[in-house]
C-alpha cells in the first residue's frame, strides 16, 4: 500500500469476499493509518461508484470474480483509476506509522433504505474497545475456534470477528459466503466452539436437514435474535452460554450484550446491560437513544444526515424501539419505522413474528404493514417452514389468532422457500422496506 502512495488518513476500498486476503488488507491499512472502506459484494456498479466517490477512496483492492460476478468489468465500467486486482499484489517494504486511537479506521456504508447508503465513520478506539468489551461478555478464550457467519464488509464481521479474534488470540474460521449446509460442515470439521449471527442465520442453520447428523462442539457466542430463536439456539445447537446482543453500525456496533454468566432466562429474553461506558435512554416515543465512546464520528461527507442522527443534546437516535427494566437492562422491541397502525392500534412486527416462531413448523417469520382501505394498514407475514414439517397459511393465521388480539393477526400470509429474492441482505438481514414492496406487488395492493 505504501508503495502505491497510500498514507495515513487515505481511504482504501476492499471489494472481495471473506478470506485471508480481506483480513490482510484490513490489518495492513490499519497499520499505516489508512481508512478501510468495505464494499458490499452484492453492490451493483452504480453503488460501488457512489461509495468510492462519497468516501474519497484513493485505491480499490478487488478480486476479479466472485459468485459469477465480474467485478473487473464493473470497475472498468465506472472508470475508477486506481483499482488493484489482489492476484497481482506483491510484497512491499513497511515503514512504521504512528497511529492514534482517535484516528479513523473504517468507513462503513450502511444498508440503504433510501436512495443510497450512508458512510459511518468509526475509529480505532471505538472498534477495538467494542471488540474487547463484546469478547469479554461472551467469554472468548485463546483456545476458542470462532466461526464467523457475517461478511467482513459489515461491522459484525470487522469489529466482532476480525478484531475480536485478533485481540483474544482465538482461531477465526469463516467462509467466503454464508450457506447453511457448508456452514454446518465447517462447524463440525473445524470443531468450532463459538459462533455469532442474527436470527435469520441461526434459523437457517437450525432448519437445515443436515443438522441432526452433525456433531457440533459449540458452547456459546452471541445472537441478535428474539426469545423463541434464543431458546432454540440453546436447545438445538447446544450453545448453553449464548449471549443476546443489540447494536448498530453507528455504534461500532454493539450497545448492549449479555454476559455468558447471566442467568439463562435473562439471556433468552434478550435482557442485557449496556457495555461499560455506554449510556442508554428511552425517548417518549420509546426510541432507544445512545451515547458514549463507541458512537460514530458522523456520516462521511454528509453533515445533514449526521445532524439528523443526533438529538439536540447529543444522543444518537437508533430508530429502534426498546424498554429498560429496573436493573437497567435493555430489551429491543423492533424498528420504530417498522411499526404499523391497524385501526389506530400500533403493531410492532417483532411481537407477531415471535408468535409465528412459536409454531413448531415455522423456521423464519417476517411481518410488515400493508395498506388497507378500512383499517389504514394490516399485517402481512412471510414465513419459511422447518425441514420435514408442514403447515398451511390458514393454520398459521389461526395459530396467531388464538394468541393475539385481532388487530395483530396478519390479514395476508405467504409460505416461501427463503427470503433471498425478496429482501435479504448479504449479512443475512431481511430489509422490511424491500419485503413490503414485494408484498404490495404480490397481493396487488
Model regions: which residues?
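Conserved AMP-binding/adenylate-forming
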Residues: 1-46, 346
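AMP-binding/adenylate-forming catalytic core of the ANL superfamily
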Residues: 43-50, 60-62, 195, 282-287, ...
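Short hydrophobic alpha-helices that are characteristic scaffold elements of the AMP-binding
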Residues: 27-32, 53-54, 154, 163-167
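Conserved AMP-binding/adenylation subdomain of ANL enzymes
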Residues: 128-145, 152-194, 204, 208
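Gly/Ser/Thr-rich phosphate-binding loop
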Residues: 184, 189-197, 206-265, 279
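Conserved pre-ATP/AMP-binding loop-to-beta segment of ANL
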Residues: 84, 92-109, 116, 121, ...
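AMP-binding/adenylate-forming catalytic domain of the ANL superfamily
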Residues: 405-427
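Structural core segment of the AMP-binding/adenylate-forming
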Residues: 3-4, 31-88, 387-389, 402
